Amino acid sequence: MSSGGLLLLLGLLTLWAELTPVSSKDRPDFCHLPHETGPCKAKIQAFYYNPIYDTCLKFIYGGCEGNANNFKTMDECKRTCAE
């Protein structure tokens, strides 16, 4: 392959790497769990990461059990799973 072709390939690979979003494999596994209210009856506003929409959303947490895809703030959710 000519040096011009190699340079073009390197440029395209660099562009692809810059434009490709962070892979979901870099997120903790629990970010892919569905939100889970749990069996308790409290009505606590919480946030979970939704991998389909690649964003954090609100849900009502019951106050016990559930899973690790449960954050007290939107910022905490985004820092952990969405960035």
UniProtKB/Swiss-Prot annotation:
Family: Belongs to the venom Kunitz-type family.
Subcellular localization: Secreted
Keywords annotated in UniProt: Disulfide bond, Protease inhibitor, Secreted, Serine protease inhibitor, Signal
Originating organism: Drysdalia coronoides (White-lipped snake)
SUPFAM superfamilies: BPTI-like
Keyword Signal: yes
InterPro entries reported for this sequence: Kunitz_BPTI, Kunitz_BPTI_sf, Prtase_inh_Kunz-CS, TFPI/VKTCI-like
PANTHER family: BPTI_KUNITZ INHIBITOR DOMAIN-CONTAINING PROTEIN, KUNITZ-TYPE PROTEASE INHIBITOR-RELATED
Protein's name in the database: Kunitz-type serine protease inhibitor 87
